[in-house]
Amino acid sequence: MAFSDKIPDVAATFRSLLPEPDRPGRVLATVERIEASQAADPLLGPLRRAVHTLPPDLRDILHGKPLGHPAHPVLVQLPMGSWTSAAVLDMLPGKGKRRAAGLLIALGVATAAPAALTGWTDWADLRKPQMRVGLVHALANSGALALYTTSLWKRLRGRRMAGRAYGLAGLTLVSVGGALGGHLAYRQASGANHAEQVAALADTEWHAIAMLSDLPVGRAVRAEVGDITVMVVREASGTVRVLADRCSHMAGPLSEGELENGCVRCPWHGSTFRLDDGWNVQGPATAPQPVFETRVIDGRVEARFPEHARKNG
């Protein structure tokens, strides 16, 4: 069969990978099967506990708390960029380019470990469907690292063609890992700020929450401020604190969390926020919690979202 005769079959295969109006396509269907598969579930608990043996302050840094967003997407640029650049240089003639490609591969191998460590730290505080995809994502990237390490070794021994072949295989595998990472971030919303929509949906009108006398002292209750579900805490001093109820990390219900030292601790993954300003004093949350202004009129507690924090447009 001539190659031209195979083109329709190749095109049909490619089209089957893409989503259609009435079905997701093979790629998405495969990833969704990974989400639902329980085959690797016995590994999830031990791996999570191993990650949680790291000191909390170190985990906060690895999560990206100082940045205000996950650190993993930042660090993965180093190995991915290095390896992709090396692949381009491998296609160009010249001894200097071969040496530069080897140096880039070495840089990618050296920076893969910190990128992976931030990824594992984030992974340990996800939901099971996310953890399943994340585990395959990590395996793909680990395989790519092994291939690139082999590629570097072959190059150092003068076996350039073998080094290029291993590098190409590594680039293919790390691209699969990257695609799964994109699914994790954009389809499954891992690493996203789950309280970001509050600033867009909340209005700045005053809304009645409850009578002050009906609010228990030192215990969180759930209420509504317009379309936003909030947690309300009446302190012993009489001050009323109102925060968005859904945790910025993974949308856990803060109103069911523990109150201690002027903070609330999320019942799902332990993110801790100050009641007075919503600051995330401890991760895994990397973003603070939206806070509402409050006032008491004739014994009635009212709340509104601050005008300066409102986001629209």
What are these regions (language model features)?
Residues M1-G313:
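Short amphipathic, positively biased membrane-proximal segments
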